[in-house]
């Protein structure tokens, strides 16, 4: 460009006008991006050369994971594993509500003076076993995977 001008000045000239309510409402009206894409381009379907919403040009969904369908076009259901034999729900075996008791939980927190050191010092000691107890204080089976 030369002589002190920048490329941005040539592309987008600056308008020095006073900011009024009219210019603010105009700016807010024309800069809202909340309008749905279907209202902005009604003929953007696949017949008009557009794309389905959520689909890319190569037919993949927009998240990049190919959709798996059965030969009949029905989506494959996810395989679910039966984990009842591994760890039965103790609530279904007992009649009362359960509480968890953690043995050996010790928490020490020392707060330093803000002028000396603005940090907290936290020490947490937790034992490995967490035992579940029902209302009558009976210990139920531990479920350890």
Curated annotation (Swiss-Prot):
Is Zinc found in the keyword set? no
Where does the record say this protein resides? Cytoplasm; Synapse, Synaptosome; Membrane raft; Postsynaptic density
Which chain positions have S-palmitoyl cysteine-type lipid attachment?
Answer: 3
Source superkingdom: Eukaryota
PTM note: Palmitoylation and myristoylation target the protein to the lipid rafts.
Give expression by tissue: Predominantly expressed in neuroectoderm-derived tissues. Expressed in the brain and spinal cord, and at low levels, in the adrenal gland. In the bone marrow, confined to the CD34+ progenitor cells. Not found in peripheral blood mononuclear cells, nor lymph nodes. Tends to be expressed at high levels in acute myeloid leukemia and glioblastoma cells.
Instruction: List residues with covalent lipid attachment of type N-myristoyl glycine.
Output: 2
Return any one Pfam family short name. BAALC_N
> Where is the region Interaction with CAMK2A?
3-35
Q: Which GO terms describe its cellular component?
A: cytoplasm; cytosol; membrane raft; neuron projection; nucleoplasm; postsynaptic density; sarcoplasm
Ranges for region Disordered: 27-119
- UniProt entry tagged with the keyword Membrane: yes
* Annotated Basic and acidic residues bias: 109-119
> What's in the keyword line of the UniProt record?
Cytoplasm, Lipoprotein, Membrane, Myristate, Palmitate, Synapse, Synaptosome
Q: Where is the composition biased (Low complexity)?
A: 32-46
Against InterPro entries, the record matches this protein to: BAALC (IPR009728)
Instruction: Give start-end positions of Polar residues composition bias.
Output: 83-108
- What role does this protein play? May play a synaptic role at the postsynaptic lipid rafts possibly through interaction with CAMK2A.
How does the annotation summarize its subunit structure?
Interacts with CAMK2A.
UniProt protein name: Brain and acute leukemia cytoplasmic protein
Q: Which organism is it from?
A: Homo sapiens (Human)
Q: What gene is this protein a product of? A: BAALC
């Amino acid at each position: 460009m030369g002589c002190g001008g920048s490329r941005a000045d040539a592309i987008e000239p600056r308008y020095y006008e006073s900011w009024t309510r009219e210019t603010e409402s105009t700016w807010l009206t024309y800069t809202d991006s909340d309008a749905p894409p279907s209202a902005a381009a009604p003929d953007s379907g696949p017949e008009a050369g557009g794309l389905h919403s959520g689909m890319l040009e190569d037919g993949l969904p927009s998240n990049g994971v190919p959709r798996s369908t059965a030969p009949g076009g029905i989506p494959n259901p996810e395989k679910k594993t039966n984990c009842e034999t591994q760890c039965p729900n103790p609530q279904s075996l007992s009649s009362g509500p359960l509480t968890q008791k953690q043995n050996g939980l010790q928490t020490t927190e020392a707060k330093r003076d803000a002028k000396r050191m603005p940090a907290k010092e936290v020490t947490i000691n937790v034992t490995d076993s967490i035992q579940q107890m029902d209302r009558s204080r009976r210990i139920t089976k531990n479920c350890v995977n």
